[in-house]
Amino acid sequence: MTEMFELNYINYLFSEKTSVTLRQMELIAEGKRTPSTLFTAEKNQLQALFLSSLSLSKSEWVDRMKKLSDLGWLTQEEGRYQITPSGQQSKKAFILNYPLLNCTLEMSDALTRKEFWHWFIFVTQILSEFSYGNKGYIPYISDRLTQNRIKKWLAEQGFPQKPLAVMWADEIKAFLETLPDELGTFIVNQMIGHNYEGMTKRQTAEKHGMTSLEVLLTTEILMDRLSRFFEESDLLKSLWDTVHKSCHYGLSDSAYRSMTFLMNGSSIHSTAAIRKLKENTVKEHVLEAVLISKYTGYKPLIPKEVYDQLRKLFLSEPSLSYAQAQQEIQQLEFFWYRLVEIERIRGCL
């Protein structure tokens, strides 16, 4: 059952536009932030695989892809895997059986979804124990740095802890009421509070008849859904925003630092000099921000005449290669080409 769910999930990730090697799948799942890996995820619509809960070794990837090929769901041509009509039918059936998957997961939120769950559980524990005047509990999160960040967030809310606990409970209740009973119970069973130890992931899997991967995916998707339930949830929104910032909005630490300079008006050259990096490294950071966080302030980094030429070329030939573009535009930087190519893929030209 565990392996069959994995196979269905991997097959679900494929679309008609997906054509990838096994190694590319592996790198995307690991959350590698190189421009080439991120671009592969974008081009092949594999954003949901980025930093995935699907944790497989190289040999396990080989095994799963072989089994998917044997099932006739995927086909392999020159080392690249593509979904077959049979695979598309299996994907539709899988979504019908697991409708939570019928959603869009952004790469920028991949780490935030995971971290937010832990902050969410810990804040619930803190406020629950406070309500009963208990200071002698074992904290859900043992890391001191994270503990201090959460305590700082609680202090910044501007409410005494007692009314804060009531507000928190009300917001959680309102969110749970939007879910089917089974999913609401799924969350509540894992929560921690005064004299209440939530279930472990293993216990949750047994209780709900799920695989371990299904528990992780369900948790992430519910946290993503929670992040969209903010119109009447000031505390939950504030916590999400704080976690998202602590996760550098999905960027690597180095890319986040470079983008901070660039967004404050620094040039690529100046940013590279200040940070003692190569200019190409800063350009890679820009591509990371565009691909992960959908940063849109990059156009001033492309000479206008070059941008206009590239746009015209892509409109006439959507599959335009860098080599072809170089024949039309002298001294064309790959960085400029890639930025406009991303626009073309996203339908923004």
Model features per residue range: what roles?
Residues M1-L56, N148, K152-K162:
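Short, amphipathic alpha-helical interface elements at domain boundaries
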Residues N8-E16, G184-G198, L251-S266, V306-P318:
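Short, amphipathic alpha-helical "recognition" segments used to contact nucleic acids or chromatin
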Residues M25, Q203-E206, T271-A273, S321-E328:
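Short alpha-helical "recognition helix" segments of helix-turn-helix
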Residues K66-G79, R228-E231, Y295, I345-L349:
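A short, conserved structural fragment
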Residues L226-V243, S293-Q309, C348-L349:
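Short Lys/Arg-enriched helix C-cap and helix-to-coil transition segments
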